[in-house]
Amino acid sequence: MNKLREQTLALASILQTTTLIDQLASTGTCDANSNQASLKSIITSSTKLEEVFNQKQDLLVGIDALKVVLSNKTKCIQHIIFYALALINLEKKLMKNQTLLNQITLEIDLIRNQDFFEISHINSIARLAQLYKSTLGGLNPKIMINGQQIYLSNKHTSNHIRALLLAGIRAVSLWKSQGGKTWHLLLNKKKILNLINTLEGLN
């Protein structure tokens, strides 16, 4: 898999998590298949995109979101872009805090090895949410989620959002491991759009 393809899929994985978060905050539900794939990425240790997201449908939501962003139709997904930029900033802070990084790595290793529940099970989501809250949740500025209060005040939904924020950090890490940088979007916009169209044609 070439570098641009890897970077594009990794960027799509970031936007997928933020899209799912926006769906949860706005409607209380989100795309089930993409949710499973994004949460599972947290406990998949590989840095190869085709191993983390190994089915074509795993990143459909993210690829759709990336296409909208690159088509300059950003007004309708401002929250999604804001969350993505906030996650990139948060991941940068995490990389400078070895104590938090070790804590997160250790807990994820435990979750991966115990494997009591499916990663999308309510208990797994609660555990991932607690991990986010006790580590990344303490860093400033905090990521403020916009949505309907009836959903944001629901414990399971708020846990689910935190779990997906953790998946978003994983996605940013994958993107950076492939050499991803925000200015690449400006330089490679046309190439990325062509690649997305090719990927969509394969589905």
UniProtKB/Swiss-Prot annotation:
Query: Could you say which protein family the record assigns here?
Result: Belongs to the HflD family.
Membrane topology classification: Peripheral membrane protein
InterPro entries the UniProt entry points to: HflD, HflD-like_sf
Predominant cellular place of this UniProt entry's protein: cytoplasm
Q: Which UniProt keywords apply?
A: Cell inner membrane, Cell membrane, Cytoplasm, Membrane
- Please identify the protein, giving its name as recorded: High frequency lysogenization protein HflD homolog
Entry's Gene3D superfamilies?
HflD-like
Family annotation (Pfam families):
DUF489
Compartments in which it is found: Cytoplasm; Cell inner membrane
Keyword match Chloroplast: no
Q: Indicate the secretion signal residues.
A: none
GO cellular component assignments? cytoplasm; plasma membrane
